[in-house]
Amino acid sequence: LIPMFTLSHGFPLTNAKLAFWILNVGLLGISTIMHYKDTTFLYYIFTGLIVLGIIFFLLQIRIIFKNRIRNKYDIGIKFSVVAYLMLGLTTILGTFIAFVDYQNIINLTLIYGYMIIFGYISMLIVGQMYKIVPFLVWYHKYSSKVGLEPVPMLKDMFNEKFAQIEFYLMITAV
């Protein structure tokens, strides 16, 4: 959805394809070796592949943002940018947790879970909702009236000031 919402096009998909395959091999490997004992070496290999896949994904997102036509970030894209930054931070923290004795650092794993759920997933969902929900409401309510009478723009479907307040409150909460 990010290329559509940022009006990006004409960018290579090499990093996206690499991210897809590397991430899936890493996830399949991790889920397979968890059923066996003495797989520490493979655990580190597959964890590294997962991290590498996320890095390629974030590089692809960066390329998409560099090729955008819209220079100004609207509120939905701002939420998404913060979500991807949080994904990068949680990847760093997750890598650290994976390679140390995390059972002695219980609070660190709680922080990691909080960052994933509220920093990455929630921010991304809210950001995409600011793009999708106004369109769906507009389409349902006003699409039949286009050309017959004045209809509001998509940006008029929600209060930008309240959205900015929500954005900063969510960042503060995370």
Mark where each language-model region is.
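Juxtamembrane membrane-water interface segments of multi-pass membrane proteins
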Residues: 1-19, 32-42, 60-78, 96-111, ...
